[in-house]
Amino acid sequence: MSHESIEKNLNFVKKLNNVNDSVLKIENLALAYDNKKVLDGINISIEKGDIVTILGPNGGGKTSLMKVVAGISKNYTGSVIFADNIKISYMPQNFSISKLMPITVEYFLLNSFSKKLKKNQSVITEVIELVGIGSILKNQVLEISAGQMQLLLLAHCLIAEPDLIILDEPVSAMDINARAKFYDIIGEIAKKRLISILMTSHDLSSIVPCSDYIICINHTIYCQGKPGKIMEDRTLGEIFSSYIAK
């Protein structure tokens, strides 16, 4: 998709009511399972059109945090405050389709929504082109690669015309080239469409170029800041040395 066509196609730019800067604020969030604290003292603010990445080790609470924001986990303390009239799309870390459901990419993309959601055909066409899945629309979902599946799920998120997209380890199944393509796409939709993105990762080197803000957690926040600043943080080096080395 050319730069010129990207500039012209802005069908799913959204405007939120009563938003100055933040589309999401998390204040003093804590979460426990079976009396074991998973998250504690989490404070996060996400501005319109920003990409905020949660960096941390496996088992450090990243997925639990995403589930709280997505409304899946309810048993937390603290506050999760959204802008008025916000629309949210969620892309989980693990997604699978039963082998008993042989459906095409196109069918999945167009039919796996609530009947209440009005789908805009111009938005659908634009999303398919932007994400680059036009060539696999007639393929069976079970036959596409893991990387293509992630692009399909991203397209599915975008068709809902969200203001905030939650991505849990979205590139874990991709090779380096597919990762670069995915990050280019989310950078495009964040800046040109003013869609905010909250995503998780355990790979610091690949998320630095596309992130506006990085928050390092291991059950609680150890350090946070803009990419250039976070790389200089001594705490990051001490706590997350294995991730810096990647």
Swiss-Prot record:
GO cellular component, one term: plasma membrane
PROSITE patterns tied to this protein: ABC_TRANSPORTER_2, ZNUC
Domain of life where this protein originates: Bacteria
Keywords: ATP-binding, Cell membrane, Ion transport, Membrane, Nucleotide-binding, Translocase, Transport, Zinc, Zinc transport
Positions of the ABC transporter domain: 24-244
InterPro entries cross-referenced by the UniProt entry: AAA+_ATPase (IPR003593), ABC_transporter-like_ATP-bd (IPR003439), Metal_Ion_Import_ABC (IPR050153), P-loop_NTPase (IPR027417)
Record-listed E.C. numbers: 7.2.2.20
Reactions catalysed according to its record: Zn(2+)(out) + ATP(in) + H2O(in) = Zn(2+)(in) + ADP(in) + phosphate(in) + H(+)(in)
Catalytic EC class: translocase
Topology relative to the membrane: Peripheral membrane protein
Chain coiled-coil ranges: none
Residues engaged in binding ATP: G56, P57, N58, G59, G60, G61, K62, T63
Example GO molecular function: ATP binding
Oligomeric and partner information: The complex is composed of two ATP-binding proteins (ZnuC), two transmembrane proteins (ZnuB) and a solute-binding protein (ZnuA).
Family: Belongs to the ABC transporter superfamily. Zinc importer (TC 3.A.1.15.5) family.
PANTHER family: METAL TRANSPORT SYSTEM ATP-BINDING PROTEIN TM_0124-RELATED
Protein function: Part of the ABC transporter complex ZnuABC involved in zinc import. Responsible for energy coupling to the transport system.
Listed name of the protein: Zinc import ATP-binding protein ZnuC
Organism from which the protein derives: Wolbachia sp. subsp. Brugia malayi (strain TRS)
